[in-house]
């Protein structure tokens, strides 16, 4: 049987079957369509304006490594006029993050981008290893997710950037939609498919890989021979997200378009006005100045519980009431430095290409 030719150029031998479309295409055409789709995602959503300082959330994994490579290449190819930086968060996970940061440092040299590394220990006075020793593995992802999100904003503020881009892909977003449905989290369900988010006191954050399948990102990294770290977090097997991931993979096996279908369904969800009226208004944390829907932001609440020897007190409202019953926080309580976001300007669209 003769080898199949590329469905796009009709010349070269097909080497890739795209999970998203089922097309069999050659390697060079795969590079072109992958890069062009990311470019069109960026331009159609008006993510950047010329002169923006953009921090790429870099973990050393496949998604962030491919994102850094593609952002640099598209910035040069289409003259976005962006100033790019790598921003890494060191959670303090021995045998995982310390090794992946070595990959990030190599990426810094390979892509010629400035690198900023901010650690949990530096910011919060705790590493994830120390936190897990206190809370166990059941709720550790809650601490890490809250601390990491705020650390990214704080690291970006230190770099004085206008924008953070992360390597969240289509699989990640579809999983998040499923998780929010299973948890009945209306507030997050209403915004989890947004390609770009920004509060009054947070830095603009977006996902250029919103419509890129994880399998295609892996194939891109493989064919481009990119340098990335492939070990999973040692604490992630116990994460709630794992259940949504298994379910999504089963759906994808039966229907490859399930990932994009779920994202489009999530985009179509609208929170009713009467439900919006019951949601908490965003304000500023009284202790650290970060955005919060309560008097104290989640990071400060979790940190206070750790510092007072009641680590799980910040997980639920009931546990928080138990901590409050112990009395006010001591004056010498370790706190997070006050947050001062950089200022940004209005967006001017970068033109799309077909």
UniProtKB/Swiss-Prot annotation:
The keyword DNA-binding does not apply. Pathway: tRNA modification; 5-methoxycarbonylmethyl-2-thiouridine-tRNA biosynthesis. It comes from the Eukaryota. It is an enzyme of class 2 (transferase). GO terms for molecular function: nucleotidyltransferase activity; tRNA binding. One of its GO terms (cellular component) is cytosolic tRNA wobble base thiouridylase complex. The keyword Cytoplasm applies. Its EC number is 2.7.7.-. Gene3D superfamilies: HUPs (3.40.50.620). Keywords: Cytoplasm, RNA-binding, Transferase, tRNA processing, tRNA-binding. Belongs to the TtcA family. CTU1/NCS6/ATPBD3 subfamily. PANTHER family: ATPASES OF THE PP SUPERFAMILY-RELATED (PTHR11807), CYTOPLASMIC TRNA 2-THIOLATION PROTEIN 1 (PTHR11807:SF12). Plays a central role in 2-thiolation of mcm(5)S(2)U at tRNA wobble positions of tRNA(Lys), tRNA(Glu) and tRNA(Gln). Directly binds tRNAs and probably acts by catalyzing adenylation of tRNAs, an intermediate required for 2-thiolation. It is unclear whether it acts as a sulfurtransferase that transfers sulfur from thiocarboxylated URM1 onto the uridine of tRNAs at wobble position. Prior mcm(5) tRNA modification by the elongator complex is required for 2-thiolation. May also be involved in protein urmylation. This is Cytoplasmic tRNA 2-thiolation protein 1. It comes from Laccaria bicolor (strain S238N-H82 / ATCC MYA-4686).
